[in-house]
Amino acid sequence: MRLDMQRTLDIITRLIAFDTTSDRSNLALIHFVRDLLAEHGIQASVLSNAEGDKASLLATIGPAVAGGVVLSGHTDTVPVSGQNWSHDPYQATLKEGRLYGRGSVDMKGFIGLCLAMVPDFLDAPLKRPLHLAFSYDEESTCLGCLPLIDHMRDTLPDVAAVIIGEPTEGRVVSAHKGVHAWRTEVTGVPAHSSRPDLGVSATFYAARIISELERTANDLRTQASRGELFEPPYSTLHVSTIQGGNATNIIAKDARLHWELRNLPGDTPDAVRARVDDFTARLALEMQEHSPECAIQTLEDYASVPALTPEPDGKAETLAFALTGQRERCGVGFCSEAGWFQDRGFSTVVCGPGSIAQAHKADEYIDIAELERYREFLIRLTRHQCTD
């Protein structure tokens, strides 16, 4: 194995050893990255969250001028609980050309490769900078990147492009769906099941809301807006979990349902939310004819992430196409922090090593060949940043 790839694997192995599940601190990993960069004379900015248990990191390599390219990834991972791993998920295992471990493909492989390339970045006669931006909480709320993005807007000269290194097998992804999640809570009136006339069943009303959500999902499937870059080529809506009642012989006082929209770029979530709010408002009035205690409320749940919209003549797409030779746009159904970067004014694409098919599952891995190919991409990017 080449020395440069061994260096990459050594760093990825160190990163995997940090348990950065989203509900835990990522500070040990961030401090490791900060210290590694400091060994090369690079001073990184560490941005802590309000609680002080998590942080993002921003570092610049090259001159402090406009035209920089940001390489960005999240440091947190999904949990391993409930998964049947063949080996310790936090001890990287190299086997048959694959590196196994939690986060190996999503996204510690990308982060480790960027860090391993730092000596190459420093040796290059960069005329425009490369920026490293590493966030937290992408796998939970996808909000940990926002303070980092705001800091970039405040401190960096004009950035030419942001490349999010989510696993795309090296393809340039110019579009992804947004994700918006809500929970709807229904409050009725309990009563003995022998006298349903004295109560208001929260579960019955929740069922009617679910039926309206299904109608909405079917309308999204058939409406004129189509997304040829996506599979399926329309916005999707589903109900994920339902809870309600506490005993068979009691008219249910409470019910709760969680539902999620995956919207095409250009399909606003506001229209779906307004339709549901209008429907539930009418249901609530009907319930309150029986009792003023009744209520229905819909609240934002775990996530709300903007879609990534293809940019006509976008700087990020133009650059990434030139570096990869790709000619046709592609989109993905999963969402990423790219939506937030674009929402805040940065030209953004998604392009990273490894396959999303290996993410979030037991025995997660990244192919070494994917890392080698992406290293060539970073070499071409570095050369580009050295040109006039």
PLM-predicted stretches and their roles:
Residues 3, 50, 183-388:
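Metal-dependent amide/peptide-bond hydrolase catalytic core
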Residues 71, 93-141, 183-186, 196-217, ...:
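Alpha-helical metal-binding/catalytic segments enriched in His/Glu/Asp
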Residues 72-74, 133-135, 162-166, 185-187, ...:
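Short beta-strand segments
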Residues 80-95, 159, 174-185:
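Acidic-glycine-rich active-site phosphate/pyrophosphate-binding loop
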Residues 2-102, 123-126, 355:
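Acidic/His- and Gly-rich active-site-bordering loop/insert found
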Residues 108-181, 386:
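Acidic/histidine-rich catalytic neighborhood of metal-dependent amide-processing enzymes
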